[in-house]
């Protein structure tokens, strides 16, 4: 456990604590519990706060449970997709919910585990957050039609040469299927010459998003979150696709006028805002945090306060 404490660094921890500073009691939902770093800090700082922690990864949840031992009786941990579980919690605890945290990053424990398939040197081609899910990265890479590969590389990886990469992968797998992440990473490096980032980075991102339905789950969550009353919502994203969804959802929440944009005059009373955006610009890690935890460098945090 001491090793976990030293290896695991919660992204934007002080900024998250600051965002939830107004909370004194009630329920906080950590939609992406992970190893429980943010939740542990919040429960420590807020003695009257209760926690609902959600995560797909049962292994990570067991570690989080151990780390939260000191707060026995103040938390309830749930397994499953956060959109579905959040909706259920909202139906039963709406008036009690005072804060909601979503950290969309992959934990260091998952990234560094060569058996999970998230890193370029992994012995598997998996990438599942939920190890009971049927779809994994190997099925995507070795079985998806070329058109489907093109779509996920274009839409989820924002890869310019999405057609070329999809066709190259199809040619190679016809001769010899990809057996692990290392195999795929080395193959991509053999013909892609991107100097700014590792040639496999965006392909791995796209496949991971597909395997875990990440953007669909985020969209479902953001739609459901509209029903929050008096709560603070804090979302940490790690790439432009996630951040755009969060940014646009928050703008939509904050709209007073819901008339058709083509209308010449407002006829809706201009009082429909669900609350206010507390972060005019996203909060990003300090240079010091990036120095200590390089994986935090792309993090962006946005915060919204819902009306009671």
From Swiss-Prot:
Keywords: Cytoplasm, Methyltransferase, rRNA processing, S-adenosyl-L-methionine, Transferase. One of its GO terms (biological process) is rRNA base methylation. Gene3D superfamilies: Putative methyltransferase TM0872, insert domain, Vaccinia Virus protein VP39. S-adenosyl-L-methionine binds at residues 36-38, 55, 82, 103, 110. GO terms for cellular component: cytoplasm. GO terms for molecular function: rRNA (cytosine-N4-)-methyltransferase activity. InterPro entries: RsmH, SAM-dep_MeTrfase_MraW_recog, SAM-dependent_MTases_sf. Its EC number is 2.1.1.199. Specifically methylates the N4 position of cytidine in position 1402 (C1402) of 16S rRNA. This is Ribosomal RNA small subunit methyltransferase H. The gene is rsmH.
């Amino acid at each position: 456990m001491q090793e976990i404490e030293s290896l695991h660094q919660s992204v934007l921890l002080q900024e998250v604590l600051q965002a939830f500073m107004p909370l004194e009691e009630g329920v906080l939902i950590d939609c992406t519990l992970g190893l429980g770093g943010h939740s542990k800090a919040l429960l420590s700082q807020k003695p009257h706060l209760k926690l609902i922690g959600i995560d797909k990864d049962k292994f990570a949840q067991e570690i989080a449970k151990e780390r939260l031992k000191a707060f026995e009786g103040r938390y309830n941990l749930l397994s499953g997709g956060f959109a579905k579980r959040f909706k259920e919690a909202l139906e039963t605890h709406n008036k009690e919910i005072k804060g909601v945290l979503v950290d969309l990053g992959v934990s260091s424990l998952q990234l560094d585990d060569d058996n999970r398939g998230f890193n370029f040197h992994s012995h598997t081609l998996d990438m599942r957050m939920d190890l009971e899910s049927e779809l994994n990265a190997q099925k995507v890479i070795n079985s998806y039609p070329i058109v489907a590969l093109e779509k996920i590389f274009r839409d989820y990886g924002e890869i310019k040469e999405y057609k070329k990469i999809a066709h190259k992968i199809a040619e190679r797998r016809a001769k010899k299927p990809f057996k692990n992440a290392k195999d795929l990473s080395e193959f991509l490096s053999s013909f892609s010459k991107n100097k700014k980032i590792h040639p496999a980075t965006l392909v791995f991102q796209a496949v991971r998003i597909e395997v875990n339905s990440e953007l669909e789950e985020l969209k479902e969550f953001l739609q459901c979150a509209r029903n929050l009353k008096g709560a603070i919502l804090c979302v940490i994203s790690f790439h432009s696709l996630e951040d755009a969804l969060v940014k646009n959802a928050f703008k939509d929440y904050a709209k007073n006028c819901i008339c058709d944009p083509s209308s010449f005059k407002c006829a809706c009373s201009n009082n429909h805002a669900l609350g206010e955006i507390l972060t005019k610009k996203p909060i990003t890690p300090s240079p010091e945090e990036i120095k200590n935890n390089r994986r935090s460098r792309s993090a962006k945090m946005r915060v919204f306060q819902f009306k009671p």
